[in-house]
């Protein structure tokens, strides 16, 4: 007898489960690494592995089959032009599941689902560069908000707010006019 040989329904209706698979597979191929529960990761992994196997051979029929599972056309292009050729010499096992512990709110078993050739160091460096550029942009905007005079002679910040000084602790609170 073949008991429990199918799939895990994840306590969802069929339509909800299909939408969940599509969303998670799309996110996996977009970001190449997602954090989810262990059970969802194990189910999504099956779909992702099959799609990567199909993406190794770029045919119209394979693209159409992948488009049934992936929401965005740009992600389908990425799958066939980037991810598929990267996995060309691998015969399976394109994804890995890393257990990271239990979620604090409901103690669910949380895991990371990622592509095997995901380069964590490269992604980390890219985010550091973006953070540095955001900090420099924040400094520029904070100078503008700090009270530099505009062309009309008044700061934009002072036009819209009244400053109220609390004498007991010398703290300033901004209050919008008209409220």
Curated annotation (Swiss-Prot):
InterPro entries according to UniProt? Ribosomal_bL17, Ribosomal_bL17_sf
Q: Which keywords, in A-to-Z order, does the entry hold?
A: Ribonucleoprotein, Ribosomal protein
The reply on keyword Ribonucleoprotein is yes
Q: Name one Pfam family in it.
A: Ribosomal_L17
GO function term, MF aspect, one: structural constituent of ribosome
Task: Determine if Ribonucleoprotein is one of this entry's keywords.
Answer: yes
Q: Where is the composition biased (Basic and acidic residues)?
A: 123-161
Its domain of life reads Bacteria
Which SUPFAM superfamilies does this one have? Prokaryotic ribosomal protein L17
- Residue ranges annotated as compositionally biased, kind Polar residues, are 162-171
Q: Which GO terms describe its biological process?
A: translation
**CC annotations in GO:** cytosolic large ribosomal subunit
User: Which residues does the annotated region (Disordered) include?
Assistant: 123-179
Q: Which residues cross the membrane?
A: none
The record, for NCBIfam families, names: L17
Q: Which family does it belong to?
A: Belongs to the bacterial ribosomal protein bL17 family.
Complex and partners: Part of the 50S ribosomal subunit. Contacts protein L32.
Protein name per UniProt: Large ribosomal subunit protein bL17
Per the UniProt record, the source organism is Treponema denticola (strain ATCC 35405 / DSM 14222 / CIP 103919 / JCM 8153 / KCTC 15104)
């Amino acid at each position: 007898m073949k008991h429990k040989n199918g799939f895990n329904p994840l306590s969802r209706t069929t339509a909800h489960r299909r939408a969940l698979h599509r969303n998670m597979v799309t996110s996996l191929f977009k970001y190449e690494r997602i954090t989810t529960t262990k059970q969802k990761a194990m189910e999504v992994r099956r779909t992702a592995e099959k799609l990567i196997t199909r993406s190794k051979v770029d045919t119209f029929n394979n693209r159409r089959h992948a488009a049934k599972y992936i929401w965005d056309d740009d992600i389908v292009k990425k799958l066939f032009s980037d991810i598929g050729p990267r996995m060309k010499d691998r015969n399976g096992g394109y994804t890995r599941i890393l257990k990271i512990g239990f979620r604090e709110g409901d103690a669910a078993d949380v895991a990371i689902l990622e592509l095997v050739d995901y380069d964590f160091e490269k992604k980390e460096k890219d985010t550091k560069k973006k953070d540095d550029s955001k900090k420099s942009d924040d400094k520029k905007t904070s100078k503008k908000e700090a009270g530099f005079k505009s062309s009309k002679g008044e700061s934009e910040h002072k036009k819209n707010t009244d400053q109220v000084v609390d004498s007991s602790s010398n703290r300033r609170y901004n209050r919008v006019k008209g409220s």
